[in-house]
Amino acid sequence: YMSDRIICPCKGLHGEIMIPGDKSISHRSIMLGALALGTTEITNFLEGADCLSTIGCFQSMGIQIDRTPEKIIVHGKGMHGLSAPKDILNVGNSGTTTRLMSGILSAQDFTSVMSGDASLNSRPMGRVITPLTQMGAHITSVNGDLCAPLKIKPGMLHGIDYTSPVASAQVKSAILLAGLYADGETSVTEPALSRNHTELMLKSFGADITSTINPDGTATAHVKPCQELYGQSICVPGDISSAAYFIAAGLLTLDSELLVKNVGINKTRAGFLEVCRNMGADITLVNESLEGGEPRADILVRTSKLHGTTIEGALIPTLIDEIPMIAVMAAYAEGTTIIKDAAELKVKETNRIDTTTEALRSMGADITPTDDGMIIQGGHALHGAKINSYLDHRIAMAFAIAALSADGDTIIHDSQCVDVSYPEFFEILDGCR
C-alpha cells in the first residue's frame, strides 16, 4: 500500500476550519473562463488533482492560465479561441472534466481525444455520447465500450430538447455547453434538479439560460446559442462535499465544537445539511451571503445525538457524494437509516454501495447493501479496523472520521487518494484534535 495512515480515536475537536474551494465550481470557472473574452480571476480555487486536469487540458489547447498562491488567472480567447491539442488530452481521474469537455470539444473545428487513468476509463460515458450525438456531434468510444478514451471529430451541432434518464449535472452540463454552439435552442429535462452550478455560472458569464421546475417535479434548463461569454471574477465557495467530513466529525466526536468557514450552501448541493437536521444535528448557519448566484455561509457544529432517517427521491442528487459519510453517521445514530434511489453510487470512483458496506462491516456496523442504496441499523459500537479505500477519496475521508469515535485504532490504506479533492484533509483533521 502506498500510504497507510493510522487514525487514533479522540474527543473534543475544536477550531475553525477553512474548506477548500468547491470542485464543481472550480472546474467550471476554468472552462467558462477559457471560452470567454478577457480574463477570469479565480480565488479559493481547488488545487486538487481533478481540477488541475481541467487546467492542463485547456493549456494543451492554447489557453494561458497563470497560477499564483492567491489566485488563478485564465486568459480567455472567446468561444472559438481554442486550438487543436498536439497530443491526447489527459483527464486523469476526473469524470467532470471528461463529461463537460465532451460538450465543448464536440463544437470545435478540430479533432481531439480524451483519456484518463484506469478508473476514469471504466466509467460510463454513453450518458453524454447519446445526447451529444443527437445534436450532431461526432464522438466515439475508442474501445467501443462507451467509456473513455473518447475521440471527438468536428460536427455541426443543432439544438435538441433532451430528456435525461438520470439527474446528472455532468450530463446536463455537457449538453448545455454544446448548446452554446448549436444552431437553435437546446433544453435538458431531468427527473429531479441536479447541481445547477453550470446554469448559475453561464448566466453570470452572459449566456441566455433559464431554468424551471416543472409541475411534475422534473427540472428543465434551456439555453440559447451564444455569441460571446465575458470573463468574470469568481470567489469559489468552500466545497460542501469536503465540509461534510468536518461537519460529521463535529457531530459524532464527543465534546466537539467546530466552525466550518465559507461553505457553499447552494440548494442543489445542501441535501447533506437537511439530512443532518433530520437526524437531530445541532447545526447553525452564520454569516450567510450570496456571490455570483452562489450562496455561502459559515457552519457551526456541535456534538449531537443522532437518530436514523430515510433518504430517497429528489434528495439523492443533492448529496450523492456525501452518502459514504452519511452511512457512517447512520451507524453511530440510534435506529434505522434507509438510503434508496441511489443506484448512481455504483458508477462513482468505486461502487460506493459495495465499498461503504465493506468498510462499515469491518468496523462492526450492521449494514445491508441493496440494489439502489443501503439499510443501516445504528447504535452498535464501532471498533477500529483496516480499511481499504480502493483509491476512492470519499471512502478514505468518511472512514477517517468514523475512526475518531471507534474503539481502537484504524488503518486507512492508500490514504493519498484524498489528494483528488482535499489534499490538506489529514493535516486539518490533526489540527482540530
Label each PLM-derived region with a short phrase:
Residues 1-433:
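Structural preference for solvent-exposed beta-strand-turn elements
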